[in-house]
Amino acid sequence: MSLWFLVFLSVLQGVTELFPVSSLGHTLLVPALFGMHIDKHAPQLLPFLVALHLGTALALLWYFRERWIALIAGFFASLNGRKNDEGHLMWALIIGTIPTGLVGLLLEKRIERVFHDLRIVAAALIINGVLLWLGDRIQRARAHRPPEKLTFKQAFFVGLAQVGALIPGFSRSGLTMIAGNAAGLTADKAAEFSFLLGTPIIFAAGLLELPKLFHAPDQLADALLGGVLTAIAAYLSVRFLMRYFEGRGRLASFGLYCVLAGLFCLGWFMFHAQPV
């Protein structure tokens, strides 16, 4: 793998995993526009992609480190019968993780095979953009509550939204922010809940494949560099996004980008052969 391509993929993963624009969709579409095909199950790429997932998860853990310490403390307090907001939120995050964990393990590879056509990925990106616009409309129409007041049923619903991101072109963070808006969270709190909810999912995606890092010792240097670059990009991304939504930023801005990018890619691959 060339150095420029390593840097490109690392930064692309770190940014698009957290921005509501579909990391998997971009990983497939952007290289294809330059005539390259990315097979994330290729043996030579697996160690590298494992490191990218771990880099993203570590960036999220570090950014929300104080929040996670409070959540874990509240969780153990709840086990001792002491009800508290942090413990309730931790249980909500656990419940929200269940749908994607189960569906992802059972169906992820099958779904990817069905949606391998880049024109379908581009169409999904367009739909993702429309949903982001609708999410803004929903958020402004709902009464607001803090994440600690989400019911477990609402947390499960938000977690269920992540399942849609198994389809390339749909964004995990985008879908969970929309679901959070529907549950009554403000834009910044929906973003925070989305990132907290996504951390164990992203971590698990890396940890499950971690042994493959050590089956390719000749690629460890590339994987380490990629992981570090992704962690930096992801940290800067989550920092920007939290400030953006705290400053009354809107999902519709990302929705417009997704629609325009999806239309461009759809038109491109209607008239150009897809790389194999």
UniProtKB/Swiss-Prot annotation:
EC number from the UniProt entry: 3.6.1.27
Pfam families, per database record: BacA
One GO MF term: undecaprenyl-diphosphatase activity
Single Gene Ontology BP annotation: cell wall organization
Catalytic activity: di-trans,octa-cis-undecaprenyl diphosphate + H2O = di-trans,octa-cis-undecaprenyl phosphate + phosphate + H(+)
UniProt membrane topology term: Multi-pass membrane protein
Segments traversing the membrane: 1-21, 44-64, 87-107, 114-134, 150-170, 190-210, 222-242, 251-271
Record InterPro entries: UppP
UniProt KW Hydrolase keyword: yes
Superkingdom classification of source: Bacteria
Record localization: Cell inner membrane
Annotated keywords: Antibiotic resistance, Cell inner membrane, Cell membrane, Cell shape, Cell wall biogenesis/degradation, Hydrolase, Membrane, Peptidoglycan synthesis, Transmembrane, Transmembrane helix
Cellular component, GO, one term: plasma membrane
Family annotation (HAMAP family): Undec_diphosphatase
Function: Catalyzes the dephosphorylation of undecaprenyl diphosphate (UPP). Confers resistance to bacitracin.
Additional information: Bacitracin is thought to be involved in the inhibition of peptidoglycan synthesis by sequestering undecaprenyl diphosphate, thereby reducing the pool of lipid carrier available.
Family, similarity comment: Belongs to the UppP family.
Full protein name: Undecaprenyl-diphosphatase 1
Annotated source species: Burkholderia pseudomallei (strain K96243)
